[in-house]
Amino acid sequence: MKTCVITGAARTAVGAYLGSLKTVEAQDLCAAAIVEAAKRSDIELGELDEVIMGDVYGYTPNVSRCAALVAGVPEEIPAYVVDRQCASSLQAVVSACQQIMSEEADVVMAGGVEVMSRLPFYLDPSARYAPFRLGDKPLFDTFNHGVTMVSSKKYPGLNMGLTAENVAEKYGITREELDAFAEDSQRKMAEAQ
């Protein structure tokens, strides 16, 4: 069985919600990261066997494919998206490793993309089969309403951010402890390179 290694990484700037990146399409941000990760790994985009990206809200159909094409990945190289909520980009990396270890691929670009400021609003599903006649109909915010639709009926309305806050409160985890854990994680990543 082949061994899977991460040869390089890149990320784009992180902006505030509805901030300076609000007009940038997800595929354009992702394409920039693909190009830079390939450069840091000293690989040509044509060497890729697959591109896999995690994307939770997915307003661009197969944003992985769109980003790959924008980045200059040859069109014969396939790409797909995984959605595992907050672990989507991690699942993309796991899926890439699985392909390499099973000898389905040699070189895979994997990561994630999300542009929260570009999330669409949507209509109540009944609008599809009961067209509007008279009266107002609500719009739903994808982030506020859509994310809670995947939650269990037992815990309605809890997205990952609220869940993290509840867990921190329940177990007495301080912000300083979280920051120290994050710093240690970054240190380990730097040492591993």
What are these language model-derived features?
Residues 9-14:
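Short polar catalytic/cofactor-binding loops
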Residues 47-54:
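Short glycine-rich phosphate-binding loop at a beta-alpha junction
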Residues 1-2, 17-46, 61-62, 68-69, ...:
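Acyl-thioester C-C bond-transforming condensing/cleaving domain
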Residues 55-60:
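Glycine-rich phosphate-binding loops at beta-strand->alpha-helix junctions
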Residues 3-8:
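Conserved PLP-binding active-site segment in aminotransferase class I/II-type PLP enzymes
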